[in-house]
């Protein structure tokens, strides 16, 4: 499966090269006709006669998928702090990941949105751990696209392959079970300088004894206060719909939020709020930075707060 990502590198390298060479401040609506590679419409939703505004969400990067069809690579990093009330008396994690998206047509895209390397440090109880996360691949299709009103709606399906190797104190954090199917719907629209986006989906465990199935949901709002500068605010939620049997007792209430799945028998709901900004250097390069923290009880979640940084390189 890693070969699929490697096969995408020629198109993604082209996107990165164009991003570096692009003139500062040009408008997406003034782009040339859609760039074609091997007969693919790599411009996707963006370009002349198509959508002219693209501000992807920042927090919940694994589940809150943009509805726009793009060819891009998106390296991201987050610093994750574990609450002091957690069974380990706190700790922190660093996650480095790379997302890839390839527009096959104006409405259809291949997406690879979960991977990465995690370095986890616990303050007590569990040993420190580092290793690779699972990989999630799939496709999405824009079933509604109206550039005139800057509105778009997209449905997609991802499969999370359980090939990660994260384990702490005998608790498998990644690489357990048979993976997940993740159907989702996402949409966006704009009102002048205001951009709105929302998504909902279900991360369905294929081995329901080992992993917990959840519903995830997100809303995003951004506003262009200066040319290319977009402050944003986001709300994300994660609710168990089918608990597993792998973690019981004190561990049975643990909520791994988006990256980790403890297979808990009594996982609760976590809702987070996030904020930050994006800055668009030109039509092909956008930077993002922000933070996120739960607004629900932190007693049984592994998240106290997160700090995010990413770079969106779009063809």
Residue ranges and their predicted role:
Residues 1-43:
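Cleavable N-terminal export/targeting peptides
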Residues 28-207, 214-315:
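Transmembrane beta-barrel domains of Gram-negative outer membranes and organellar outer membranes
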């Amino acid at each position: 499966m890693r070969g699929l990502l490697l096969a995408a590198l020629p198109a993604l390298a082209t996107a990165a090269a164009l991003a570096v060479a692009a003139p500062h401040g040009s408008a997406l609506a003034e782009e040339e006709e859609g760039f074609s590679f091997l007969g693919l419409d790599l411009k996707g939703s963006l370009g002349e006669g198509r959508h002219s505004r693209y501000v992807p969400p920042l927090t919940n990067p694994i589940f809150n998928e943009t509805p726009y069809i793009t060819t891009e690579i998106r390296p991201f990093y987050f610093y994750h702090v574990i609450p002091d009330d957690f069974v380990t008396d706190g700790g922190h994690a660093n996650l480095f990941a790379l997302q890839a998206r390839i527009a096959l047509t104006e409405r259809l895209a291949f997406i690879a949105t979960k991977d990465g390397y995690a370095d986890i440090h616990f303050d007590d109880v569990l040993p420190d751990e580092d290793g690779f996360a699972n990989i999630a691949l799939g496709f999405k299709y824009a079933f509604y696209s109206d550039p005139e009103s800057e509105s778009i709606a997209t449905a997609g399906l991802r499969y999370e392959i359980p090939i990660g190797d994260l384990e702490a104190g005998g608790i498998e954090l990644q690489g357990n079970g048979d993976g997940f199917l993740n159907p989702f719907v996402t949409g966006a629209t704009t009102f002048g300088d205001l951009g709105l986006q929302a998504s909902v989906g279900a991360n369905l465990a294929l081995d329901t004894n080992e992993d917990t199935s959840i519903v995830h949901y997100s809303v995003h709002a951004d506003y262009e206060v200066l040319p290319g500068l977009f402050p944003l605010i986001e709300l994300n939620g994660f609710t168990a719909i089918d608990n597993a049997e792998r973690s019981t007792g004190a561990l049975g209430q643990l909520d791994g939020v988006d990256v980790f799945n403890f297979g808990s028998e009594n996982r609760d709901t976590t809702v987070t709020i996030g904020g930050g900004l994006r800055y668009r250097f030109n039509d092909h390069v956008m930077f993002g930075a922000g933070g996120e923290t739960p607004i629900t009880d932190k007693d049984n979640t592994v998240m106290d707060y997160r700090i995010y940084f990413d770079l969106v390189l779009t063809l």
